């Protein structure tokens, strides 16, 4: 039961950090390549 409580307290923190980093990455990509339907990396 203690492991379940530890998991339930760690998972929201990790998911918040992950989604925050993902949102920041998407914002930076949209800043450098605005309105890109395909990425001009090729």
From Swiss-Prot:
Keywords: Chloroplast, Membrane, Photosynthesis, Photosystem I, Plastid, Thylakoid, Transmembrane, Transmembrane helix. The keyword Plastid applies. May help in the organization of the PsaE and PsaF subunits. It is a single-pass membrane protein. It comes from the Eukaryota. Belongs to the PsaJ family. PANTHER family: PHOTOSYSTEM I REACTION CENTER SUBUNIT IX, PTHR36082. GO terms for biological process: photosynthesis. It is found in: Plastid, Chloroplast thylakoid membrane. InterPro entries: PSI_PsaJ, PSI_PsaJ_sf. GO terms for cellular component: chloroplast thylakoid membrane; photosystem I. This is Photosystem I reaction center subunit IX. HAMAP family: PSI_PsaJ. The gene is psaJ. It comes from Solanum tuberosum (Potato). The chain crosses the membrane at residues 7-27.
């Amino acid at each position: 039961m203690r492991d379940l409580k530890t998991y339930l307290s760690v998972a929201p923190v990790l998911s918040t950090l992950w989604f925050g980093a993902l949102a920041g990455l998407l914002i930076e990509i949209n800043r450098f390549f605005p309105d890109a339907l395909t990425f001009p990396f090729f």
